Design a protein with these regions (language model features):
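N-terminal capping segment at the start of a domain
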Residues: 7-23, 171-173
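Thiamine diphosphate
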Residues: 105, 109-222
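Glycine-rich beta-alpha junction loops
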Residues: 34, 64-65, 69, 173-174, ...
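Cofactor-binding active-site loop characterized by glycine-rich and histidine/acidic residues
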Residues: 14-17, 29-160
């Protein structure tokens, strides 16, 4: 499956699964659909066995986008595809937030914002101690959670320990539940902040497949001494025109007719 097709898969299945659940985080998923699609299009070192010890790890610090991750894990065969139809149902392993104890391919249970980078630091340090020289730990962050002080404690720790096997990706969509980051509390300049903590930083268009894949391929070896940060400039709700730049769809539910129309637009845009 091509890279763009994976991003479209994430969006289509997010709409379908939220229709099953009754509500969910459409626009937060849509802003990082290309980013998640890229990670599962050859960027991460993963295998058929989701428990392979030397695999890359992915921490969804913005755990409320798990509904977009599940179709990618099912596509890889980590769990049966019919699990998707049970999303958020009583007894289902697939909840609003990812559960590492119940879902193959999930590397850490997340949900409360601000914790993911600290977890990533611990995993990157553990990989070094175990001699997993090619293992990289990826952390997908939302921009508004950068207001959590724990993020910057982790950023300082990563630099101090020389964790060149850690890469943070910031989904900089500039919008959260309460409004834009400028209205609530600015987190800019994101790149300069990470650089001040000793990270290598690059900014790119988070909806440009070529830019994402090119930058991922250009990352320094995991044996390096500087952690990496990719600031991905994205649009909240990207892929469905009436959701773009609207906080209305941070969490919500589409009627069946609106859901069908959204899927048509996703397919047309590719």
């Amino acid at each position: 499956m091509l890279f763009r097709s994976r991003a479209a898969l994430v969006r289509r299945e997010t709409i379908r699964l939220i229709e099953i659940a009754g509500n969910g985080h459409y626009s937060s998923v849509f802003s990082c659909a290309e980013l998640m699609g890229a990670l599962y299009s050859g960027v991460m070192r993963i295998a058929e066995d989701p428990e392979w010890p030397e695999r890359d790890r992915l921490i969804l610090s913005k755990g409320h986008v798990a509904v977009g991750l599940y179709p990618l894990l099912a596509e890889r065969g980590y769990f049966p595809a019919d699990w998707l139809d049970s999303y958020t149902r009583l007894g289902s392993p697939l909840g609003d937030h990812p559960d590492m104890r119940r879902i193959p391919g999930v590397d850490f249970s997340s949900g409360s914002l601000g914790h993911g980078l600290s977890i990533g630091v611990g995993m990157a340090k553990a990989a070094r101690l175990r001699g997993y020289d090619e293992t990289r730990v990826w952390v997908l962050l939302g921009d508004q959670e950068l207001n959590e002080g724990q993020i910057w404690e982790a950023a300082g720790s990563a630099s101090h320990f020389g964790l060149g096997n850690l890469c943070a990706i910031v989904d900089a969509n500039q919008m959260g539940l309460d409004g834009t980051t400028e209205e609530t509390m600015s987190v800019e300049p994101i790149g300069a902040r990470f650089a001040a903590f000793g990270w290598d930083v690059v900014e790119l268009d988070g909806h440009d497949p070529a830019a994402i894949l090119t930058q991922a391929a250009a990352l320094p070896a995991t044996t390096g001494a500087k952690p990496q940060c990719i600031v991905a400039r994205t649009v909240k709700g990207n892929g469905v025109s009436y959701m773009e730049l609207s906080r209305t769809w941070h969490i919500g539910w589409l009627s069946p007719d609106d859901a069908a129309a959204a899927v048509v637009e996703i397919d047309q845009r590719g």
